[in-house]
């Protein structure tokens, strides 16, 4: 049975559970549940603190886990990213009072407060900057106001918390993060377990594709087909079928959801009709 770690709270928890549900896996009904078994899919889910997941996975006790890229790197655990999931995107930045610094070179001799000591210390060392790092668990924005540090380093999603604290980001981003699937470095030697892991990854990849694309169908005159296909090439090739009316064909292809309205406009201008899109709920490519 595959053993998988899932975030039990925070910004990763809800979207992770939603993605797993879309992939056909049972999820907990009560937030207090720490473990559930999905017997039909032969998977056991463990709901853990997001910051601890990389440690559990690297120990080999759990096969794979869903966590943040920033948390994986900060942990220093013997685990690696195997699939980005496209949600909980954020940027890790330095911030301070206006005028404190313009770039990382201005941090020499200063103190940086952060909840991600591993990431920050390595970034400073790699940049040749001699600065002190103070570890705080959450709400690092107050560190400057209380005189604990001159600068903070934190995850920035909207920047609202920083602005409310009178702080501004500066310099280049330290890193960009998102939710990822991780596993222990060197895992994958057991063929039976590897088969289950790959099936799990295919399901999640199917969800990602289903969220990104829609299926588009339309009717088109045969003489305009090449131009129409150029607008809707599909992932490999569109499906084309002759219609009862001579000189007309039906076309079906997957198109990026974000571009669907523009493509429909272009097809209509080309003379295509009966243009419609259908949501994709699951797929395997």
Curated annotation (Swiss-Prot):
EC number in record: 2.4.2.17
Pfam families per record: HisG, HisG_C
Keyword rRNA processing: no
Cofactor: Mg(2+)
Pathway: Amino-acid biosynthesis; L-histidine biosynthesis; L-histidine from 5-phospho-alpha-D-ribose 1-diphosphate: step 1/9
Record localization: Cytoplasm
Regulation: Feedback inhibited by histidine.
SUPFAM superfamilies xref list: GlnB-like (SSF54913), Periplasmic binding protein-like II (SSF53850)
Main location: cytoplasm
Lineage: superkingdom: Bacteria
A GO cellular component entry from the record: cytoplasm
Molecular function GO labels: ATP binding; ATP phosphoribosyltransferase activity; magnesium ion binding
Catalytic activity: 1-(5-phospho-beta-D-ribosyl)-ATP + diphosphate = 5-phospho-alpha-D-ribose 1-diphosphate + ATP
Keywords per UniProt: Amino-acid biosynthesis, ATP-binding, Cytoplasm, Glycosyltransferase, Histidine biosynthesis, Magnesium, Metal-binding, Nucleotide-binding, Transferase
Cross-referenced InterPro entries: ATP-PRT_HisG_long (IPR020621), ATP_PRibTrfase_cat (IPR013820), ATP_PRibTrfase_HisG (IPR001348), HisG_C (IPR013115), N-reg_PII-like_a/b (IPR011322), N-reg_PII/ATP_PRibTrfase_C (IPR015867)
GO biological process annotation, one example: L-histidine biosynthetic process
Role noted for this protein: Catalyzes the condensation of ATP and 5-phosphoribose 1-diphosphate to form N'-(5'-phosphoribosyl)-ATP (PR-ATP). Has a crucial role in the pathway because the rate of histidine biosynthesis seems to be controlled primarily by regulation of HisG enzymatic activity.
Database matches in PANTHER family: ATP PHOSPHORIBOSYLTRANSFERASE (PTHR21403:SF8), ATP PHOSPHORIBOSYLTRANSFERASE ATP-PRTASE (PTHR21403)
The family this protein is said to belong to: Belongs to the ATP phosphoribosyltransferase family. Long subfamily.
Protein name per Swiss-Prot or TrEMBL: ATP phosphoribosyltransferase
Organism of origin: Streptomyces avermitilis (strain ATCC 31267 / DSM 46492 / JCM 5070 / NBRC 14893 / NCIMB 12804 / NRRL 8165 / MA-4680)
The encoding gene: hisG
